[in-house]
Curated annotation (Swiss-Prot):
Its EC number is 3.1.13.4. GO terms for cellular component: P-body; PAN complex. Forms a heterotrimer with an asymmetric homodimer of the regulatory subunit PAN3 to form the poly(A)-nuclease (PAN) deadenylation complex. Contains a pseudo-UCH domain. This ubiquitin C-terminal hydrolase (UCH)-like or ubiquitin specific protease (USP)-like domain is predicted to be catalytically inactive because it lacks the active site catalytic triad characteristic of thiol proteases, with residues at the equivalent structural positions that are incompatible with catalysis, and it cannot bind ubiquitin. It functions as a structural scaffold for intra- and intermolecular interactions in the complex. The linker, or PAN3 interaction domain (PID), between the WD40 repeats and the pseudo-UCH domain mediates interaction with PAN3. SMART domains: EXOIII. WD repeats lie at residues 104-143, 276-315. Keywords: Cytoplasm, Exonuclease, Hydrolase, Metal-binding, mRNA processing, Nuclease, Repeat, WD repeat. This is PAN2-PAN3 deadenylation complex catalytic subunit PAN2. It comes from Coccidioides immitis (strain RS) (Valley fever fungus). The gene is PAN2. A divalent metal cation binds at residues 873, 875, 982, 1071.
Length: 1222
């Protein structure tokens, strides 16, 4: 060890998982051919580090975590050999597995070494067998028995092996017989090394107190003469030793406290001492070159020692292979005019498959006819295949043409769009209700005389017109007061399960009480359920969407690993998927609940079946008891014939439920006493039943399915008693008798709902529905059941007989929910009085950016109360563009609308001394890819939503959402413009009584047009907002006089310069403040009784200027060929006068952040002349004269909207009676 040796680098041992803490290294070794240091941990992971800087190179899972730590490394030309307690693993240095060997008798491997043959190794341990493994073949070639239990092996002239008793056996390299044996230490040998003719050992001995201590001597042995040599004293305690690879008599000895000693075995008085900066040393390793030393400590670190100027692991090492750095593709100037051929295609030398000639296309045999699912339950095995009775659905010799697509698909026809109904039936009575009732109560198809029950179970699908989802008539599918859930969202197959959970009163109470706390965890599924349940309550039959909840669900890595997400369901049945999601939901909400209430057992009492599980070995009778709590019970069906169910009590639902809860099974498992796998019996003993009993039907075959086909098999009520640690279940007459006799301890459950899979053959695509008894969660007490079908956004009442009938092959139960009967009507709304509003009075930021000076957080004395007005405005960015299908005739159909993400929320005070001052101005961080920031309308720029670069106050979506949710439930009244669109994108439901939308305040019943906020600001206040450009005008005047001519005229030249700056987009604070001012002004008009006159004037001026503010400056106005006014409607002061037009302005006309199309100047001017009062047209005629500049404007002119939160008021929809203020 030279004088400049010191610690060169230090690296932490990689943790076993991405969210786990680092662990100590169990073994360390230098590669003998490359500049790599290999490290093994306690969980079977092997990692490598490159060079003196210890850069991470590879990391692989070589052994199972159950096998414990990695014990030792050996190096071969093919790769790295690692050893664990039960296996030997060879992987290339790049991490690819070459072979993995395990054996039943490999129970406690500890060490290995190369033999006399370089391609064979011997492995041994605390076991009676040693194995010879051929590295080239990757197989065990020999097995040797031994009476010694070895812990360490080192190869030199002989094979030196340390035993667990402190002895060292010198083994022959040919037959592995014991040549010599020494008792090196009193207890165990902790470390040893052998090189050339010397063997050095370090170990422990037992002293008088009975505990082992480190020996202060390192024993030395001569392998040539097989005699011991004088030991080397080491007063700090010799714990680790390594021989120098190039100096034959030099060794490194170290203590557990980090003291290093370099000593010459032939001259022990010549020593070199160093102290390593470690708390507790666990290992020592020397590189093959002798220039580097690796120290492993108890603080999960690896320390590399050496000379900084010339440290190398190997004298002549091979070059380490690294992954290729991919060449970045060249940047293309991509635009709408860029031809596709600039992208290019790969070089090819053969003809492409796409060039297949048409004359080589032939028709082959027809596809086989699909099996009729009606005969599947009746199949019987035979010698070859299976057989069943012919159902005789076809005539003799009649076959099915499988090439033709089935045109008899049973489906509920989509209703007409609201715009079509308003356009086609302007004066007729609304018939949409009659159409919906007829469809949902059973339409007659193909002349059938009976009602077709499949219609309401059909797949429902949202259709989109050019006006988006607002034009779809959801009320056609739902005439009830219970809201459905939309389907155009990823993982919406869980809608049926969410509806079932919502109508369980005790689960609903848990979710709402949890969300009213200060929980701000972004991935809290229980909070999202609370938000959804509250939204469904407030919707009162209007369609809702579970966007935020399903987005949170999609973000769980565990859900993706379990294959629970929609993209993983291609080869998985919906029935098994929803049952897995059911288990995941309940386990996750239990975890979320405990994060807020770690010491509360309310959720466990509600959902968890408390039980203990006893595991008994059938051989030695050793028994282990562990907790066996479960949130979901999987039904286990008996092997009895369902046909004998009426005579066999074991086939009753109550007995199947009892055996499923108190299940007793036999399986093979590990017995710690026998130390091997044995047959074990597992029995569960129930200690407490939950208030809500959640079941999975677990139908795996046709025999299970036949139990459900028995009429009346599923009971509406069940009774459960626990007597002497045994559970008893009752149903029917048995339950009724025990209820009448008031049996002590009897708990009665009633069925809340069922999730079922609907698989109608003609539809070719299964889906899920839920049946719910809504009377259980009704606020008004009632004993009569009221069953409803929830088929996504189709909601209708159904009879109890239809719910409990499962003898149809297309309906299969998946999940059931029973609730204790005393919890009926148990809706607890006390959470509304216990809202934790701390978030409203606290500055929350992800990037430590305080709110701007414009924003002032609410003070405690400003706590909102019911009726407090607040003004709201939001901005959004595009996460996905709309999917448009272009048909063969050129028509376009929207398949899926664009997907927006909330980017900014601004809320300002609507009353008080600080009226108009914002108290919320949050930018929301978005993890999803953003396809368009729509800066010209949103004001959001790239980088504004990135915590690393944003200059704004960034919060998580849940924080921004919860602030609005708190304000909603405090009773605040939201003032804004176009709030319906904002609320839909935010995914929040606000009652009409808490909404004031200036879009509907300034609505003329006979004009059929909604005015933009920008135009209203100009029409009411003559102010300009939402301007795309900032214009600066400068004027210079030059006067010239000829002095040679008396009384000469003076000429004056005026130069005007106009400078424009790029668009900055909308400011949500400015828009919210303007909406608040418009509401205040409207109240003044109401008090004065001049609302109608003002609206007439606003619309009259709007016709003149095209419902857009006129140009602010003269040079911005476009000459109108039909207008002879030399100033073109612009006064000398630069402010527009009524009647001026700007037909080619690109500013929005109406709607929220809606871009307009550019109209030709002639067309717009002609429209203004034709439609204006000068043209002699009526008000309707003037409206038709103004050409719509967007599809949404065209729709607004064809039909009127009511103030019902932005939805259409029926098929007629042509009148609007009054403002929402009245």
């Amino acid at each position: 060890m030279e004088a400049d040796w010191d610690e060169v680098s230090q690296v932490a041992v990689p943790p076993p998982g991405p969210h786990l803490l680092p662990t100590v290294a169990s073994t360390v070794a230098f590669d003998d051919s490359q500049e790599l240091l290999w490290v093994g941990n306690e969980f079977g992971r092997v990692s490598s580090f490159y060079g003196p800087e210890l850069q991470r190179y590879t990391s692989v899972k070589a052994h199972a975590s159950s096998e414990g730590q990695v014990r030792q490394f050996l190096f071969h030309d093919k790769g790295v050999i690692s050893l664990s307690a039960n296996s030997v693993h060879l992987a290339s240095r790049c991490g690819l597995t070459q072979w993995h060997i395990s054996h039943p008798e490999m129970t406690e491997l500890r060490c290995m070494s190369f033999t006399a043959q370089p391609h064979k190794i011997i492995v041994a341990g605390l076991q009676s067998a040693m194995f010879i493994i051929d590295v080239e073949k990757g197989a065990i070639v020999d097995q040797l028995s031994t009476e010694y239990r070895y812990t360490i092996m080192k190869r030199s002239r002989y094979l030196c092996a340390a035993t667990d008793t402190g002895s060292v056996n010198v083994l022959s390299l040919t037959d592995f017989s014991v040549v010599k044996s020494w008792k090196a230490h009193g207890a165990v040998i902790n470390d040893m090394d052998a090189r050339n003719d010397f063997l050095v050992t370090c170990g422990f001995s037992v002293r008088h107190a009975g505990s082992p201590i480190v020996d202060p001597l390192a024993n030395v042995y001569d392998l040539k003469s097989l005699i011991p040599l004088p030991p080397i004293p080491f007063h700090a305690g010799a714990a680790f030793v390594r021989m120098h690879p190039r100096l034959q008599t030099t060794s490194f000895i170290a203590s557990q406290t980090g003291q290093l000693q370099v000593v010459d075995l032939m001259n022990p008085n010549t020593i070199n001492l160093r102290q390593a900066n470690v708390a507790f040393m666990l290992g020592l390793e020397v590189s093959p070159s002798g220039e580097a030393l690796a120290i492993n400590d108890a603080e999960c670190s690896i320390h590399l020692w050496g000379s900084p100027s010339k440290i190398h692991f190997n004298e002549i090492g091979k070059e380490t292979e690294f992954s290729d750095i991919p060449t970045r593709p060249s940047m293309l100037d991509w635009s709408n005019d860029t031809p596709l051929n600039v992208i290019g295609m790969p070089y090819y030398h053969e003809r492409l498959l796409s060039a297949w000639p048409s004359h080589l296309i032939f028709e082959i045999g027809n596809a086989p006819v699909p099996m009729d699912p009606a005969i599947l339950p009746y199949l019987r095995p035979s010698e070859i295949g299976q057989y069943a009775q012919n159902p005789r659905k076809k005539r003799r010799y009649q076959v099915e043409n499988t090439r033709l697509q089935s045109s008899t698909e049973v489906a509920l026809a989509a209703p007409k769009f609201l715009s079509e109904k308003a356009r086609e039936l302007p004066n007729s009575k609304p018939e949409g209700a009659q159409e919906a009732v007829g469809a949902l109560q059973g339409l007659k198809i193909n002349g059938e005389t009976k009602e077709d029950p499949l219609l309401k179970y059909s797949n429902v699908e949202i259709k989109y017109s050019k006006f988006g989802v607002d034009d779809f008539d959801f009320r056609y599918y739902n005439k009830t007061e219970f809201s459905g859930l939309e389907t155009h969202i990823a993982n919406s197959f869980t809608n049926s399960l969410l509806q079932l959970l919502k109508f369980i009163p005790l689960v609903r109470n848990l979710a709402l009480h949890h969300v009213s706390t200060n929980c701000l965890c972004e991935s809290c599924l229980l909070c999202e359920m609370g938000f959804l349940f509250d939204m469904l309550d407030k919707a009162n039959g209007q369609n809702c969407q579970a966007t935020n909840l399903l987005k949170t669900f999609s973000g769980f890595r565990e859900a993706a690993n379990l294959g629970l997400l929609e993209e993983s369901l291609s080869n998985k049945s919906l029935s098994s998927a929803i049952q897995s999601v059911h288990r995941f939901f309940l386990n996750q909400i239990a975890h979320d609940y405990r994060t807020v209430y770690p010491n509360s057992d309310s959720l466990d009492n509600t959902l968890s079946t408390a039980a203990v599980e006893s595991i008994c070995c059938m051989f030695c009778r050793n028994e282990i008891v562990r907790p066996g709590n479960a949130f979901v019970t999987e039904l286990i069906y008996p092997a009895a014939d369902p046909k004998q169910a009426h005579r066999n009590q074991a086939c009753r639902f109550s007995n199947i439920l009892r055996s499923s809860i108190e299940r007793e099974t036999q399986n093979r498992g590990w017995c710690s006493t026998c130390r091997r796998y044995q047959q074990v019996s597992i029995r569960k003993t129930v200690q407490r039943m939950p208030l809500v009993l959640m079941l999975n039907a677990a139908i795996n075959n046709s025999a299970h399915r036949r139990f459900w086909s028995i009429p009346g098999w599923l009971p509406e009520k069940i009774g459960v008693m626990i007597e002497d640690n045994q559970i008893q279940c009752y149903e029917g007459e048995q339950l009724r008798i025990r209820q009448q006799n008031n049996f002590e301890g009897l708990v009665v459950y009633e069925l809340v709902g069922i999730v079922a899979e609907i698989d109608i053959v003609e539809q070719k695509k299964p889906h899920l529905v839920s049946f719910v008894d809504v009377s259980i969660s009704a606020r008004e007490p009632t004993k009569k059941s009221n069953w409803h079908l929830f088929n996504d956004f189709l909601v209708t009442g159904v009879s109890k007989e239809e719910v409990f009938s499962f003898n149809q092959g297309w309906k299969s139960p998946c999940t059931l929910a029973y609730q204790i009967s005393t919890g009926r009507h148990g809706l607890d709304d006390s959470w509304k009085n216990e809202l934790d509003t701390t978030l409203l009075f606290y500055e929350w930021s992800m990037n430590n950016r305080p709110p701007t000076d414009k924003c002032h957080i609410l003070k405690s004395e400003e706590k909102p109360i019911a009726g407090t007005p607040i003004a709201l405005d939001t901005e959004f960015v595009d996460l996905e563009k709309a999917e448009i299908e272009v048909k063969a005739d050129g028509t376009q159909e929207m398949i899926r609308p664009s997907k927006s993400g909330l980017a900014r929320v601004s809320v300002i005070r609507g009353s008080g001394n600080d009226e108009g001052v914002p108290f919320i101005d949050d930018y929301i961080t978005i993890k999803d890819p953003i396809v368009d920031y729509v800066t010209q309308y949103s004001g959001i720029k790239p980088g504004d939503l990135d915590p690393r670069t944003s200059r704004h106050n960034l919060v998580a979506l849940k924080v921004a959402y919860k602030k609005l949710w708190l304000l909603l439930n405090l009773g605040c009244v939201f003032v804004g413009h176009g709030l319906a669109s904002d609320f839909r994108k935010i995914n929040i439901q606000v009652p009409k009584a808490q909404t004031i939308d200036t879009q509907y305040l300034f609505f003329h019943p006979g004009k059929n047009r909604r005015l933009s906020l920008r135009y209203l600001a100009w029409a009411v206040f003559k102010e300009y907002i939402q301007e795309e450009t900032t214009t600066t005008t400068s004027t210079s005047i030059t006067t010239t006089t000829n002095p040679n001519i008396h009384d000469a005229n003076t000429s004056t030249t005026t130069t005007t310069a106009i400078t424009t700056t790029p668009p900055e987009g909308h400011d949500s604070i400015e828009d919210a403040r303007m909406a608040l001012r418009l509401w205040k002004k409207f109240k003044e008009y109401e008090d004065a009784g001049i609302v109608n006159q003002i609206l007439e004037e606003i619309f009259r001026e709007g016709v003149k200027v095209g419902f857009r503010p006129p140009a602010r400056y003269p040079s911005q106005a476009t000459p109108n060929p039909n207008n002879n006014n030399i100033n073109n409607g612009v006064n000398p002061n630069g402010l527009s006068t009524p009647g001026s037009t700007n037909p080619i302005s690109r500013l929005p006309l109406s709607g929220r952040n809606t871009p307009d199309f550019i109209l030709p100047a002639s067309a717009s001017a002609a429209a203004s002349v034709t439609g204006g009062p000068a043209g002699g047209g009526s008000s309707n005629g003037s409206m038709s004269g103004s050409t719509p500049s967007t599809p949404r404007q065209a729709f607004r002119r064809s039909t009127a909207l009511t103030p019902s939160n932005g939805s259409f008021g029926g098929a007629k929809g042509l009148t609007f009676g009054g403002s929402p203020m009245r």
